[in-house]
Regions:
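Polytopic alpha-helical membrane-helix bundles and their juxtamembrane interface segments
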Residues: 19-99, 112-256
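N-terminal secretory/membrane targeting signals
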Residues: 1-23
């Protein structure tokens, strides 16, 4: 019963947000691939958010916070994508700058997940939490400042990539990488490696998009929106599902 109440609350809250967001917008045409991609990811994010919150009580207590954060990530992205969709339908475009509203919150939360899954199976220093958080905030903030021309675009890109390289070092060879290798928890290590792959491969799309949009000015806005939409769909939802899989495997092993 508690699960059903929680699921109902999450779905109703998100649908209420959706209704308010769509109150005064034009209709989406069926042949508009960009607009359709906004709807596809919005519905996927809504479903993922409900799923992660619903599944919290299916896993052991030390893993619940990871699913809570996964639900928060997809929930924030869902709300922002409704806004992006409305901007696109009403104005015919949705610039990348609007996406930073989402990224400045969700990407640091995704990096914090590395700390949380490690903390679920072993003791890790709190300093790791702050390293991952600050590194990711700098990465996104520098890119935003460059994209909005508050600082030179090339400087914004350089700082952002530098911060990205720093957090990659942390999760591959730094404190986080060492802690994962020593954990001895196979489901967690498997999830950690998969999440790490998303951060290096999936996140590479964002600086590439920055280069085409703000450095060379050669990006097709519609294509860029579709690529970003699909990247966010995979990066955010897959990230959470990977964590859920590890949480379920650890819970099953613990209950044997």
């Amino acid at each position: 019963m508690k699960r059903l109440k929680l699921l109902s609350f999450v779905v109703l809250a998100l649908l209420a947000t959706s209704s308010a967001s769509n109150a005064n917008t034009d209709l989406l045409t069926a042949d508009d691939l960009v607009g359709v991609s906004f709807w596809v990811i919005s519905m996927g994010l809504l479903a993922a958010t409900a799923f992660f919150f619903f599944e919290r009580r299916s896993v052991s207590s030390n893993w619940r916070i990871t699913l809570t954060v996964s639900g928060i990530i997809t929930g924030i992205a869902f709300i922002n994508y409704l806004y992006l969709r409305n901007v696109y339908v009403s104005q015919g475009e949705a610039t990348t700058l609007y996406r930073y509203i989402d990224w400045i919150i969700t990407m640091p939360l995704q990096m914090i997940q590395f700390y949380l899954i490690l903390a679920a199976v072993r003791k890790v220093p709190k300093s790791l939490f702050w390293k991952l958080l600050i590194g990711t905030v700098v990465m996104v903030l520098a890119a935003y400042l460059g994209a909005s021309e508050n600082i030179p675009t090339i400087i914004g890109l350089t700082i952002s990539i530098g911060a990205w390289v720093y957090i990659l070092y942390e999760i591959f060879s730094g404190e986080a990488g060492i802690a994962a290798a020593k954990s001895g928890n196979k489901p967690m290590v498997s999830a950690y490696v998969s999440m790490r792959t998303i951060v290096i491969a999936g996140w590479a799309i964002y600086p590439l998009g920055y280069v085409f949009a703000y450095i060379t000015n050669s990006a097709d806005d519609n294509l860029l929106n579709i690529v970003y939409n699909m990247a966010d769909f995979i990066n955010k939802i897959a990230f959470g599902l990977i964590i859920w899989t590890a949480a379920m495997q650890n819970t099953t092993t613990r209950n044997r």
